């Protein structure tokens, strides 16, 4: 997952833009608006350090969350991953505070 995040950060700016949005409009090939894709990432917009992320939830894996954070240093990022959680957003908030020293 960290390798995937690195690829997105450094080589896929269009994907980073999409995973940073709370919602993204979806258009048909002919340009007609179809609907808004809604993110399930409750932490988007909660901190200026959160650039984007990916959520996941299955019976087998439980709640999963990957977040990409920007630090105060140029070109320095933190990738936090929570796997198999019953409270992925709460656990991620705690991890983010520790990682950022806040």
Named regions from a protein language model:
Residues 2-102:
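Penicillin-recognizing serine hydrolase domain
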């Amino acid at each position: 997952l960290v390798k995937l995040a690195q690829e997105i950060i450094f080589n896929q700016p269009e994907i980073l833009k999409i995973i940073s949005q709370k919602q993204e409009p979806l258009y048909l090939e002919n340009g007609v608006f179809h609907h808004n894709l809604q993110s399930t990432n409750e932490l988007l917009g909660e901190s200026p350090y959160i650039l984007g992320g990916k959520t996941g939830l299955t019976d087998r894996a439980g709640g999963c969350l990957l977040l990409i954070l920007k630090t105060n240093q140029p070109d320095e990022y933190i990738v936090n991953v929570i796997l198999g959680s019953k409270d992925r957003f709460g656990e991620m908030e705690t991890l983010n505070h520790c990682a950022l020293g806040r």
